């Protein structure tokens, strides 16, 4: 993999790490919305082997606005092929570790509202080590999708009694630096971050949101 940045990497407060896969239609809008947040000190985009113009769009944005518009550094990390979202998130955490006090993991497809990061940062400053965004408006999804998701969480929570997963919680989370360090030390081949996070035992809070 290789990376390019619009400015030198410096230690910061909160980094946003976003996995990207075939998001050319929305990636520039995503960047703009993240950069509008005063809580964010760095945006790291991890391209997971996109086959469309995602990388071209990001590089074009860097060239056009990197100097004048991006007081927040925007870094592009390119994976050599499509490794999957878990691998992309881990690559981003590896890259960010040691440079910041907290990392926000978020999808770049705008299914997660970047503006919620302000509330996540506030919860973190009040002592939370993990802040998880939980959807509370799943009525627009198909009944089959809602039913299968609910079934998965019920079965998982019955089988694994040492941890409990929340239905509606995805990968949109803020992680403190100690949590990032703990996760990057776990090098499982087939990762399931939703299960690894509660297992680490750090103080966690949840924030509800609607799409």
Predicted regions and their residues:
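A conserved acidic beta->alpha catalytic loop
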Residues: 47-56, 110-111
């Amino acid at each position: 993999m290789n990376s390019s940045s619009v400015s030198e990497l410096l230690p910061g407060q909160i980094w946003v790490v976003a996995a990207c896969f075939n998001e050319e239609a929305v990636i520039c809008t995503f960047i703009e919305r993240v950069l509008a947040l005063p809580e964010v000190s760095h945006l790291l985009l991890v391209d997971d082997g996109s086959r469309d113009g995602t990388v071209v769009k990001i590089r074009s944005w860097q060239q056009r606005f990197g100097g004048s518009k991006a007081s927040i550094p925007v870094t592009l990390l390119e994976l050599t092929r499509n490794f999957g979202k878990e691998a992309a998130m881990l690559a981003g955490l590896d890259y960010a570790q040691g440079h910041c006090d907290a990392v926000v993991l978020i999808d770049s497809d705008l299914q997660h509202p970047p503006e919620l990061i302000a509330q996540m940062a506030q919860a973190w400053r009040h002592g939370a080590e993990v802040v998880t965004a939980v959807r509370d408006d799943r009525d627009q999804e198909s009944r089959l999708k809602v039913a299968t998701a609910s079934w998965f969480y019920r079965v998982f929570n019955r089988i694994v009694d040492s941890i409990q997963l929340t239905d509606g919680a995805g990968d949109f989370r803020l992680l403190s630096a100690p949590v990032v360090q703990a996760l990057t030390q776990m090098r499982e081949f087939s990762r399931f971050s939703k299960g690894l996070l509660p297992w680490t035992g750090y103080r966690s809070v949840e924030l509800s949101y609607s799409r």
